[in-house]
């Protein structure tokens, strides 16, 4: 995402939280931990999440597989949600050292 080599990523650690914090330090990344069908779907549909963070310790393999499938198959709705994502991107660009 940050370098443009990939459109999306999936990170898995104990809770999914540490990976999420680290991923969100990379410009252009919008990462969140998802733990159920609704968070996986809405993270894409309303927030255009491009990095899915999952817990290996708290979720079964069956649930992880299902969440990945939902997340990969769900499209961003755009519209009013796109404006919110643009605001987030604007804040990010103002916070980066290069200003870009």
Residue ranges and their predicted role:
Residues 29-36:
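Short hydrophobic/aromatic-enriched beta-strand-loop microsegments
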Residues 5, 14-16, 47:
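Conserved functional loop/turn residues at catalytic and ligand-binding sites
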Residues 37-100:
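C-terminal binding/interaction regions
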Residues 1, 23, 43-44:
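Hydrophobic residues within well-ordered alpha-helices
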């Amino acid at each position: 995402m940050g370098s443009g080599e990939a459109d999306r990523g999936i990170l898995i650690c104990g809770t999914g939280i540490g990976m999420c914090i680290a991923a969100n330090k990379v410009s252009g990344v919008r990462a969140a931990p998802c733990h159920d069908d609704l968070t996986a779907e809405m993270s894409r549909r309303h927030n255009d999440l491009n990095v899915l963070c999952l817990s290996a310790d708290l979720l079964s393999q069956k649930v992880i597989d299902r969440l990945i499938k939902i997340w990969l198959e769900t499209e961003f709705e755009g519209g009013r949600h796109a404006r919110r994502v643009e605001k987030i991107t604007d804040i990010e660009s103002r916070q980066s050292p290069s200003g870009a």
